[in-house]
């Protein structure tokens, strides 16, 4: 670990500013430097090399760290509130206990980063790479996690209250004991995720089944530009993942209506298996129905509870 004087740091930052403005200078190389006793508030360190730097407890509030190399950096308990970390490389970085409230981490690489007990409330993590990261007991309340890669991530005991996980990939993530009250999970991939003792409420979007859990009900599916009206039977297995698309193992065909002409048909073939035919009055069934509800596109008769959703489906 290297040590530098305040004067040397000032010179490095001035040269970096010139480099950023294409006025000469050079890109700041602060790799493996102990920066704990230095002031970097409001500094522009975008594109700088801080690989392996010691930034523990440092105040980086509102600092520009866009595209910065922070691989293996030690940022434990650092103040990164409202910091610009868009596209930053934080692979294997230690951010345990760091304050990242309102930080912009859009498309940042946080693969295998340690974020235990970090405060990421209101942070923007859209499309960030958090594969294999440790976010145990972290605060992600109100965070933007849309399209974020959370596969194999540890989110146990994390607070995701009001977080937006739309289309996030949480494949094989640990979400045990996580608080998902008011969270949006629409389109999120939860296949293989550990959801034991997860906390939800009626306002958690995408977690509860999109279809009735018990009893018979009407469902709709699209096939060959027709809407097939189905009666999902009382004893039919049924499931949904995190969208409004559902699956069942058997259903009775009630009506088949052409979407464009409103004319009735007696039978129609499946768009995905031409040998699977829906005939009015008959019960169609699947022998190899997949009981894993989070495997949304697996085997089963796919349908929607809303007729309009079926019409809109492509």
For the regions a protein language model found, what residue spans apply to each?
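Intrinsic low-complexity/IDR segments
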Residues: 1-82, 86-87, 91-92, 96-102, ...
